[in-house]
Amino acid sequence: MTKLIGLTGGIATGKSTVSKLLATKLPIVDADKIAWQVEGPGQPTTQKIVAHFGQQAVLADGRLNRPWLGQLVFNDAQALQALTAITRLPIQYAMFEAIVAANQQQPDAIILDVPLLFESGWQHVCDQVLVVTASPAVVLQRLMARNHLSQQAAQARIDSQMPLAQKVARADVVIDNGANIDKTKAAVLKWLKTITK
């Protein structure tokens, strides 16, 4: 039977790097990519977001105004709860469809790449959970550079999520994706050998 492996980490820990390494051997169900599809222009979920947050939640072409929404929800817990309430079920449904499709290949395992895996309860369907980690200083630096944020704005985004230490404590496997990519690759390959035939 195909195993479901959860992959998560804190913001800017380098989870996408690990996901790309895993994708060389196993199918990936990427919650972020699915969310972009579910929240695309004209989609029912996008319409519900606009109904709740107003027209400023979308750009002129109908795509979500993600910078505006991000600024809002990372500074307002109630707004984050409202957005999550609108998006959670449609994204979960689309993810289950993607899992069924990936399982048609009969892989050894399917990777569920879910940034908010514990927060959304996906760990309950996983056989194992991998958590990608990096030091707080590295995470802050990466987030500021990647998203062009001030230190204060980056820290607010980090603080809005479950603490990385809690995720690590709940992990079956921890992959350190600090400064050395070669060590990260070695850790991923070592873990893959335990899963793949």
Curated annotation (Swiss-Prot):
PANTHER family per record: BIFUNCTIONAL COENZYME A SYNTHASE-RELATED, DEPHOSPHO-COA KINASE-RELATED
GO BP terms, alphabetized: coenzyme A biosynthetic process
Record field: catalytic activity: 3'-dephospho-CoA + ATP = ADP + CoA + H(+)
Family of the protein in this entry: Belongs to the CoaE family.
Pathway(s) it belongs to: Cofactor biosynthesis; coenzyme A biosynthesis; CoA from (R)-pantothenate: step 5/5
GO molecular function: ATP binding; dephospho-CoA kinase activity
Source organism, top-level taxon: Bacteria
EC number: 2.7.1.24
Localization annotation: Cytoplasm
InterPro entries the record matches: Depp_CoAkinase, P-loop_NTPase
The name this protein goes by in its record: Dephospho-CoA kinase
Binding site for ATP: A12, T13, G14, K15, S16, T17
Keywords carried by this UniProt record: ATP-binding, Coenzyme A biosynthesis, Cytoplasm, Kinase, Nucleotide-binding, Transferase
Function field: Catalyzes the phosphorylation of the 3'-hydroxyl group of dephosphocoenzyme A to form coenzyme A.
Domain DPCK residues, every copy: 4-197
Annotated CDD domains: DPCK
Keyword Chaperone: no
A cellular-component GO term for this protein: cytoplasm
Broad enzyme group: transferase
